[in-house]
């Protein structure tokens, strides 16, 4: 799964991805669950979700969509999370972000296909080291424009 996610971040998202140890530790501590999509014994997608009492949050999702289009790996990964939320008695499934309103964004279109409500609760940003933050913003812009 991490290999599929890494390739997605390298080729399309074009931003740094947390190291694999982040994901392993979240799993070991019981913070995250991994929902894997397999086809013929091979992992072709999946998601990492985190939950509280009423909401399941889809932190990461990926799939080999071009290569395995007849299996719909990204759709199945998200659907698995929605099923987990329902089975756990959660009332919400948060797909974590839909981009800026009015700016074309394929991910938002994908998420909208599942129905539900588009809700913006806002994001909070506390910059502890402004110069380092500005440097990081510049580096991410460079990576995205490659």
Q: Residue spans of the language-model regions?
A:
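Alpha-helical elements of Rossmann-like donor-binding domains used by nucleotide-donor carbohydrate transfer enzymes
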Residues: 3-4, 21-22, 76-80, 106-109
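Short, high-confidence coil segments that cap the C-terminus of an alpha-helix
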Residues: 32, 87-90
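Polar/charged side chains located within well-ordered beta-strands of beta-rich proteins
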Residues: 47, 58, 78-81, 111
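A conserved beta-strand-loop-helix scaffold within acyl/acetyltransferase catalytic domains
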Residues: 1-70
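Active-site/acyl-donor-binding loops of N-acyltransferases
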Residues: 90-146
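Conserved acetyl-CoA-binding loop-helix of GNAT-fold acetyltransferases
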Residues: 69-85
